[in-house]
């Protein structure tokens, strides 16, 4: 609910940006996109920056969505907001997130030599006033976010208990891969995840682990296949739980 409120404030233009921090696979992107869709937004490559991104791509996305009421989604933003983010990207984001700007907007600049052109070869000004809202999603914890960015935006740490995660997944389950996975497979996956948790098995509960379960169940057509499926699921959950190097 807190996340929905932060996103709502950006949608309404009350706050220029929110940075949502949390472990991968907990439904951050899915729920943000659902809320944006409900508010009438269509998120496409034109207003979404995903994963690694050059300063030029970031600037052009902001330039093309500079109006009041526009929303830019920066998804999987680790390479743009973390300790190893390029200085040019940090500077562009700092300007775009400046909450002290006047009614004219936030002055965003891209200091590059020579002429700046968009993907169609059309010249683009190297500075512009921007009034869009920004939603930034990262797997980094709040403390790992660049301090200057952290001070310019609301930040939320999405740290859920296993019980919370199961409730979140159950709530969004009907909409997860609805074109590929049957509700029957998803219900079996949900029940089996809950069973593994109750038994104290090593498991990393996330939307991704749920999808893994459901995909395996989707191909289990008889009792023998079902037993094999559950063995495969247990193995995948065990492998997922022992992965190291998590940022969050």
Tell what function each PLM region has.
Residues 1-13:
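N-terminal pre-Walker A segment at the start of P-loop NTPase domains
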Residues 144-164:
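A short helix-turn-beta junction within AAA+ P-loop NTPase domains corresponding to the substrate/partner-engaging
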Residues 12-32:
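Walker A/P-loop nucleotide-binding motif
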Residues 75-77:
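Walker B catalytic acidic pair
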Residues 175-242:
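Conserved AAA+ ATPase small/helical "lid" subdomain
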Residues 26, 38-70, 79-86:
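AAA+/P-loop NTPase substrate/partner-engagement loops
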Residues 84-130:
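Conserved catalytic/switch belt of AAA+ P-loop NTPases
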């Amino acid at each position: 609910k807190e996340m929905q409120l932060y996103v709502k404030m950006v949608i309404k233009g009350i706050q220029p940006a929110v940075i949502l921090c949390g472990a991968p696979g907990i439904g951050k992107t899915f729920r943000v996109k659902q809320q944006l869709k409900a508010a009438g937004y269509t998120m496409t490559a034109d207003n979404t920056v995903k994963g690694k991104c050059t300063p030029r791509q970031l600037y052009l996305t902001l330039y093309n969505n500079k109006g009041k009421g526009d929303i830019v989604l920066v998804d999987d933003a680790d390479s743009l907001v973390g300790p190893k983010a390029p200085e040019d990207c940090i500077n562009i984001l700092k300007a775009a997130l400046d909450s002290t700007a006047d009614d004219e907007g936030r002055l965003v600049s891209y200091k590059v030599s020579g002429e700046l052109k968009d993907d169609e070869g059309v010249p683009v000004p190297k500075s512009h006033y921007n009034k869009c809202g920004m939603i930034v999603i990262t797997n980094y914890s709040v403390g790992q976010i660049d301090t200057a960015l952290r001070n310019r935006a609301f930040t939320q740490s999405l740290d859920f208990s296993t019980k919370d995660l199961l409730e979140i997944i159950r709530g969004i389950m009907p909409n997860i891969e609805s074109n590929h996975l049957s509700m029957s497979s998803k219900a079996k996956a949900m029940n089996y995840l809950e069973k593994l948790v109750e038994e104290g098995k090593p498991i990393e509960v996330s939307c991704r682990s749920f999808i893994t379960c459901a995909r395996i169940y989707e191909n289990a057509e008889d009792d023998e296949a079902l037993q094999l499926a559950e063995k495969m699921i247990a193995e995948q959950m065990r492998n997922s739980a022992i992965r190291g190097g998590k940022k969050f």
